Curated annotation (Swiss-Prot):
GO terms for biological process: nitrogen fixation; regulation of DNA-templated transcription; signal transduction involved in regulation of gene expression. Member of the two-component regulatory system NtrB/NtrC, which controls expression of the nitrogen-regulated (ntr) genes in response to nitrogen limitation. Under conditions of nitrogen limitation, NtrB autophosphorylates and transfers the phosphoryl group to NtrC. In the presence of nitrogen, acts as a phosphatase that dephosphorylates and inactivates NtrC. SUPFAM superfamilies: ATPase domain of HSP90 chaperone/DNA topoisomerase II/histidine kinase, Homodimeric domain of signal transducing histidine kinase, PYP-like sensor domain (PAS domain). Autophosphorylated. PANTHER family: SENSOR HISTIDINE KINASE, SENSORY HISTIDINE KINASE_PHOSPHATASE NTRB. Its EC number is 2.7.13.3, 3.1.3.-. ATP binds at K329. Keywords: ATP-binding, Cytoplasm, Hydrolase, Kinase, Nitrogen fixation, Nucleotide-binding, Phosphoprotein, Transferase, Two-component regulatory system. It comes from Escherichia coli (strain K12). This is Sensory histidine kinase/phosphatase NtrB.
Length: 349
């Protein structure tokens, strides 16, 4: 009776579509299957003996936590790890386990697109719920503010002692400040006037406005796609969105300065708010600042969340609201030395 030849472990690993690495406790690579070589853009010979972090611009894996789990005799899994190599970002699911010979087997699988889309939709729903809650509170605050201000005005007219007017003035000024904050929290409630024209007109207005604020050590670079089709949009609202993002980039660079790139591209076959579009406009704002702190990234679009001292945390929340009204989306990637916001606006189905 004929028996089939059993494949060895090397053949199995070489045939896997997931990236497999064998690393030691110093994270030096001892084996990389073909999928891992393709991911890391290096041959097996060049990878051998090289510590994994040296090959990457950024790797969000919590290596200390992984090593603690392995030392405790447990496996380790992180379902959303960002890996950046040669300027390309990959979202991976990473699993690690200790082998009998003491080596660490690291398996890296691309995050399933459907699962990633579901996570994005859930996160967006949570952000919308948070925004609606803040708006409800803002409405409740705004109503008594009007009464407070009106009462202070009447009181200022009735006070016999002019020296007391200073107190009513403070009340009125603070009521106005709170009302302005509430108006910003509420944001635009209705779609504005749409026109069909090149998005580059808005981009150029933003460049003109921001150029007046640029210090000498910051470069603003334009990288436009001249073939980008015209699209229907509210120029004032899109200008506000891009201004918020570009100014955030400028503030993130700080006194050290750096570079901001305003880029436009055509995106193809994109799903936005459950609708499939053959064409969409992509507007990127990229900077080489310190990056967004990891603890802020999941809640960055929530109202009142800011990584900047003195910031209100409203700019990105309002920006997402405006882009939602255009049936578009905003997403970002960030690691030390790189942050990129991408705005997608539909052109045609």
């Amino acid at each position: 009776m004929a028996t089939g030849t059993q494949p060895d472990a090397g053949q199995i690993l070489n045939s896997l579509i997931n990236s497999i690495l064998l690393i030691d406790d110093n994270l030096a690579i001892h084996y990389a299957n073909p999928a891992a070589q393709q991911l890391l853009a290096q041959s097996s010979r060049k990878l051998f003996g090289t510590p994994l972090p040296e090959l990457l611009s950024y790797f969000s894996l919590n290596i200390e936590l992984m090593q603690e789990s392995l030392e405790a005799g447990q496996g380790f899994t992180d379902n959303e790890v960002t890996l950046v190599i040669d300027g390309r970002s990959h979202i991976l699911s990473v699993t690690a386990q200790r082998m009998p010979d003491g080596m660490i087997l690291l398996e890296m699988a691309p995050m399933d697109n459907q699962r990633r889309l579901s996570q994005e939709q859930l996160q967006h729903a949570q952000q919308v719920a948070a925004r609606d809650l803040v708006r409800g509170l803002a409405h409740e605050i705004k109503n008594p503010l009007g009464g407070l201000r009106g009462a202070a005005q009447l009181l200022s007219k009735a006070l016999p002692d002019p020296s007391l007017l200073e107190y009513t003035k403070v009340i009125i000024e603070q009521a106005d400040r709170l009302r302005n904050l509430v108006d910003r929290l509420l944001g635009p409630q209705l779609p504005g006037t749409r026109v069909t024209e090149s998005i580059h007109k808005v981009a150029e207005r933003v460049v003109t406005l921001v150029s007046m604020e640029l210090p000498d050590n910051v470069r603003l670079i334009r990288d436009y796609d001249p073939s980008l089709p015209e699209l229907a949009h509210d120029p004032d609202q899109i200008e506000q969105v891009l201004l918020n993002i570009v100014r955030n980039a400028l503030q993130a660079l700080g006194p050290e300065g750096g570079e901001i790139i305003l880029r436009t591209r055509t995106a193809f076959q994109l799903t936005l708010h459950g609708e499939r579009y053959r064409l969409a406009a992509r507007i990127d704002v990229e900077d080489n600042g310190p990056g967004i702190p990891p603890h802020l990234q999941d809640t960055l679009f929530y109202p009142m969340v800011s990584g900047r001292e003195g910031g209100t945390g409203l700019g990105l929340s309002i920006a997402r609201n405006l882009i939602d009204q255009h049936s578009g989306k905003i997403e970002f990637t960030s690691w030390p030395g790189h942050t990129e916001f991408s705005v997608y606006l539909p052109i045609r189905k």
